């Protein structure tokens, strides 16, 4: 069975929707690959290989599970919406406002 890109995106959102309820942040699907993203704080960014819309994060930490989520990273800057592939963290968008708990 082969799903179209839009059907796959709708399926991903329907499966992830209940888990996103009540989060103080919002991360859309990745702009380059339509993966689910979560907030990461990174010390820096370099252009991702073969992409015009994404960046590879440098020394990143996942802050999605922080009890008191804040929009400021420990070393300054703001969290970015990213996904991980192996040891790499790929970021494509800014973190948006979610639903407060």
Swiss-Prot record:
Q: What is its main location?
A: secreted
Could you tell me the superkingdom of the organism this chain comes from? Eukaryota
Is Disulfide bond among the key words of this record?
yes
Arranged from A to Z, the UniProt key words for this protein are: Conidiation, Disulfide bond, Secreted, Signal, Sporulation
Task: Please verify whether the record's keywords include Secreted.
Answer: yes
Q: What upregulates this protein?
A: Expressed after 12 to 24 hours post induction of asexual development, which correlates with the development of metulae and phialides. Expressed in vegetative hyphae.
Which region is the signal sequence? 1-21
Q: Where in the cell is it found?
A: Secreted; Spore wall
Protein species of origin: Emericella nidulans (strain FGSC A4 / ATCC 38163 / CBS 112.46 / NRRL 194 / M139)
Function field:
Aerial growth, conidiation, and dispersal of filamentous fungi in the environment rely upon a capability of their secreting small amphipathic proteins called hydrophobins (HPBs) with low sequence identity. Class I can self-assemble into an outermost layer of rodlet bundles on aerial cell surfaces, conferring cellular hydrophobicity that supports fungal growth, development and dispersal; whereas Class II form highly ordered films at water-air interfaces through intermolecular interactions but contribute nothing to the rodlet structure.
Question: What does the record note on quaternary structure?
Answer: Self-assembles to form functional amyloid fibrils called rodlets. Self-assembly into fibrillar rodlets occurs spontaneously at hydrophobic:hydrophilic interfaces and the rodlets further associate laterally to form amphipathic monolayers.
- S-S pairs: 27-81, 41-73, 42-60, 82-91
Name of the protein in its database record = Unclassified hydrophobin dewD
């Amino acid at each position: 069975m082969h799903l179209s890109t839009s059907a796959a995106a709708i399926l991903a959102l329907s499966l992830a929707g209940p888990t996103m309820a009540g989060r103080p942040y919002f991360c859309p699907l990745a702009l380059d690959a339509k993966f689910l993203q979560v907030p990461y704080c990174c010390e820096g960014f370099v252009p991702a290989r073969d992409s015009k819309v994404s960046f590879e994060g440098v020394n990143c930490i996942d802050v999605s599970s922080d009890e008191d989520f804040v929009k400021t990273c420990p070393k300054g800057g703001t969290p970015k919406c990213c996904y991980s592939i192996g040891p790499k963290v790929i970021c494509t968008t800014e973190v948006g406002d979610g639903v407060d708990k």
